[in-house]
């Protein structure tokens, strides 16, 4: 049985919950950044075996605003920003003494990784894994609106009405959005691993404040996120992973692949937003081999 260590790291007046898989080795740990904002580390537990397979610690944490970390919803406008989440990431590295890391960001976590690398130029990041993520909020929204056109006409109309009026409470909209997310994120069925189905704590206000009411209407404080042209300056090895049916469409993934000087892209057939869940064994093997090759 692998060793699991749980810690609460002080972060200003708050605390960050951290979960460490395995014992320290001479290989750089893998640090995981979850999506959302506000999704919590839970689903990353399906990658625990990567610690053993690749001979290193795998470290995950709940970002401020969700999970077992502090949830300062009363300070949402100042707490739930890219700047604060980057400071938290820096604090996690500092508190745990993570001089050398491999960094994996899934969905919003990939945005956080790119903001961190482009704007803060940190040292000691050996490689980057961009899991179903994006370099442009605008392209992401455009692509998802293209996918919405494949929904039944009534569902398209419900989504359009919600976006036009700003009222996302109607049952018709909620049903349409749920259908869209079943198709392109992941359909939650009882046979999925427990960490994926586990009810997450908090996170909804972090999501609304940072991103917006849904995946395709980025009206939160990250709405201007645009890093496509900055990718050319990132020379570290980068592995992009995505699914054919992903919210991260092949065009979104290709826009990152084309602009990163040292990138590899693995496209998972038949997968949505979580190939690491839907093709777990294949994903673990890919990730472990990548980490070993980049040590």
Swiss-Prot record:
Pfam families: Abhydrolase_1. Changing residue 38 to D: Loss of activity. Changing residue 105 to E: 0.2% of wild-type activity. Its main location: other. Stable at temperatures below 40 degrees Celsius. It catalyses: Release of N-terminal proline from a peptide. Changing residue 273 to Q: Loss of activity. One of its GO terms (molecular function) is monoacylglycerol lipase activity. The keyword ATP-binding does not apply. Disulfide bonds: none annotated. Residues 29-279 form the AB hydrolase-1 domain. It is an enzyme of class 3 (hydrolase). Inhibited strongly by 3,4-dichloroisocoumarin, bestatin and heavy metal ions. Inactivated by p-chloromercuribenzoate, but reactivated by dithiothreitol. Its EC number is 3.4.11.5. Changing residue 106 to L: 21.8% of wild-type activity. KM=0.2 mM for prolyl-pNA. One of its GO terms (cellular component) is cell envelope. Changing residue 108 to Y: 37.9% of wild-type activity. KM=4.0 mM for prolyl-pNA. Keywords: Aminopeptidase, Hydrolase, Protease. One of its GO terms (biological process) is proteolysis. Changing residue 88 to K: Loss of activity. Homotrimer. Releases the N-terminal proline from various substrates. Has a high specificity towards di- or tripeptides with proline at the NH(2)-terminal position, but is not able to hydrolyze longer peptides, or peptides with hydroxyproline at the NH(2)-end. Partially hydrolyzes also peptides with alanine, glycine and leucine at the NH(2)-terminal position. Belongs to the peptidase S33 family. This is Proline iminopeptidase. The gene is pepIP.
């Amino acid at each position: 049985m692998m060793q699991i260590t749980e810690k609460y790291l002080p972060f200003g007046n708050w605390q960050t919950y951290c979960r460490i898989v395995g014992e320290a080795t001479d290989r750089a740990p893998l640090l995981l950044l979850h999506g959302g904002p506000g999704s919590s580390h839970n689903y990353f537990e399906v990658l625990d075996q990567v610690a053993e397979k690749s001979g290193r610690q795998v470290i995950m944490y709940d970002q401020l605003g969700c999970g077992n970390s502090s949830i300062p919803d009363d300070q949402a406008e100042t707490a739930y920003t890219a700047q604060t989440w980057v400071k938290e990431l820096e604090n996690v590295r500092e508190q745990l003494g993570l001089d050398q890391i491999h960094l994996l960001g899934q969905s919003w976590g990939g945005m956080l990784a790119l903001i961190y690398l482009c704007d803060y130029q940190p040292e000691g990041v050996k490689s980057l894994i961009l899991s179903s993520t994006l370099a442009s909020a605008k392209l992401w929204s455009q692509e998802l609106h293209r996918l919405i056109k494949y929904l039944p006409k009534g569902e398209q109309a419900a989504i359009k009405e919600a976006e036009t009026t700003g009222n996302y409470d109607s049952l018709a909209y909620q049903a349409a959005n749920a259908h869209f997310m079943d198709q392109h994120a992941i359909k939650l069925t009882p046979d999925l691993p427990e960490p994926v189905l586990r009810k997450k704590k908090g996170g909804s206000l972090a999501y609304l404040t940072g991103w917006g009411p849904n995946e395709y209407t980025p009206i939160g404080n990250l709405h201007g996120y645009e890093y496509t042209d900055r990718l050319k300056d990132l020379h570290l090895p980068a592995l992009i992973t995505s699914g054919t049916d992903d919210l991260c469409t092949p065009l979104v993934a290709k826009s990152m692949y084309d602009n990163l000087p040292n990138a590899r892209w693995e496209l998972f057939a038949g997968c949505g937003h979580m190939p690491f869940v839907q093709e777990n064994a294949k994903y673990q093997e890919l990730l472990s081999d990548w980490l070993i090759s980049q040590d």
